[in-house]
Amino acid sequence: MVTKTSFLSFEISELVKKNVGYITQIIGPVLDVASSPGKMPNIYNSLIIKGQNPAGQEINVTCEVQQLLGNNEVRAVAMSATDGLTRGMGAVDTGAPLSVPVGETTLGRISNVLGEPVDNLGPVQSSTTFPIHRSAPAFIQLDTKLSIFETGIKVVDLLAPYRRGGKIGLFGGAGVGKTVLIMELINNIAKAHGGVSVSGGVGERTREGNDPYMEMKESKVINEENISESKVALVYGQMNEPPGARMRVGSTASTMAEYFRDVNKQDVLPFIDNILRFVQAGSEVSALLGRMPSAVGYQPTLGTEMGSSQERITSTKDGSITSIQAVYVPADDLTDPAPATTSAHLDATTVLSRGLAAKGIYPAVDPLDSTSTMSQPWIVGEEHYETAQGVKQTSQRYKELQDIIAILGLDELSEEDRQTVARARKIERFSSQPSFVAEVFTGSPGKYVSLSETIKGFQMILPGELDNLPEQAFYLVGNIDEATAKAAALQVEGQ
């Protein structure tokens, strides 16, 4: 009779002869793999484990080497579920990092972290693959031109304008409108955008990947009749996937974007939702690898991981990458290490406010917390800069007066302060805007407002030219002419 132990020893000895490693320990998504002397895989090499589980079903798991433990053992993180794996199973070292298909054949398709299609439209017919771990461009290759990236969203274009070829972060807690704002930007920008887009779904709900996919199909960014004419590639790693997949799905999306920038020399527009999930996945992996946690339980390598991923998605002289990233803010605390580390890499931060969302002001962009490196008079022009500063000063004064108003009421304010409050409330309402992607819920058609129209509108409110119009006339309108027309309609209704 052959015991299980002797059978396992026999299997392992055969694998060693064939120069294939074997699993010695499994702790959830983390595996220890032993290899023959002198044949240890390098850090980031991918290992492939194939076999059958006890029920006889085929298993195919890809892992990435994270640590060299000594004694010819490595520790690897699985990119898919480890259900059914057993000690002693063979692990083949591919001799290189994980590589994914890149190029035009990825457009219109949804891939996972391994570059495998998950949209039931057959395999991706690509002969070109890139490794997901690549160096950031050298300083000499970087593009330093400064130009505004118009979005058609009033409050964004005026107060915290985006830089073409820059990095943009949408910061907000749960349920304040980050994903809707990303979908609105896809609608406003990706349609008119001459290059291609890459959408990276990092550890979010499946629904939040499905909604943009349907939106892209409706707006013909994804062409169902002729998939090769699509303008976007999608890479998803949802919440239910192991931390290894959630940690690396952003690298897969970056790799696809880099191909379009470096090889095709195109302008690329990557959307990443959500950066915090990437950090959380890294935190899970870090704990499983036995590293000492840092502040608030995050991984000690948070700054390094964030830097290496952010520095890759940058603009070079070959092509620009304008990345738009949603950043979930835990407990609405912007000083949390994850959003604080992310903001250091960004050219513009759009902060979404729960207070504004509660008032029904959408997009709920906070005019005082949102920042942009482009908000300089020598970049945006004196007129734009002065208007934006006027809006911020009025909003700041209104914020300072709110405690007094809450305790004593408006009547106790000076005439000048009452006037400031009235204008600030009109500015707040004029900052709202009907959304294209929310048309089905609101029933009001979306509006795209040019930067010149936006500046003109706020310039009329600030000095008091429109003091005679009621506040509600400014709510959910496009340009200032629509507000005037709405005021006239409200007056007729009142009579």
Swiss-Prot record:
Assembly notes: F-type ATPases have 2 components, CF(1) - the catalytic core - and CF(0) - the membrane proton channel. CF(1) has five subunits: alpha(3), beta(3), gamma(1), delta(1), epsilon(1). CF(0) has four main subunits: a(1), b(1), b'(1) and c(9-12).
Record-listed E.C. numbers: 7.1.2.2
Keyword Ribosomal protein listed: no
Family matches, as CDD domains: ATP-synt_F1_beta_C, ATP-synt_F1_beta_N, F1-ATPase_beta_CD
Catalytic activity, as annotated: ATP + H2O + 4 H(+)(in) = ADP + phosphate + 5 H(+)(out)
Superkingdom: Eukaryota
A GO cellular component entry from the record: proton-transporting ATP synthase complex
UniProt entry keywords in alphabetical sequence: ATP synthesis, ATP-binding, CF(1), Chloroplast, Hydrogen ion transport, Ion transport, Membrane, Nucleotide-binding, Plastid, Thylakoid, Translocase, Transport
Family annotation (Pfam families): ATP-synt_ab (PF00006), ATP-synt_ab_N (PF02874), ATP-synt_VA_C (PF22919)
Molecular-function GO terms, alphabetical: ATP binding; ATP hydrolysis activity; proton-transporting ATP synthase activity, rotational mechanism
Membrane topology, record value: Peripheral membrane protein
Record's keyword annotation contains Chloroplast: yes
Family from the record: Belongs to the ATPase alpha/beta chains family.
GO BP annotation list: proton motive force-driven mitochondrial ATP synthesis
SUPFAM superfamilies listed in its UniProt record: C-terminal domain of alpha and beta subunits of F1 ATP synthase, N-terminal domain of alpha and beta subunits of F1 ATP synthase, P-loop containing nucleoside triphosphate hydrolases
Function statement: Produces ATP from ADP in the presence of a proton gradient across the membrane. The catalytic sites are hosted primarily by the beta subunits.
Origin species: Pteridium aquilinum (Bracken fern)
Protein name: ATP synthase subunit beta, chloroplastic
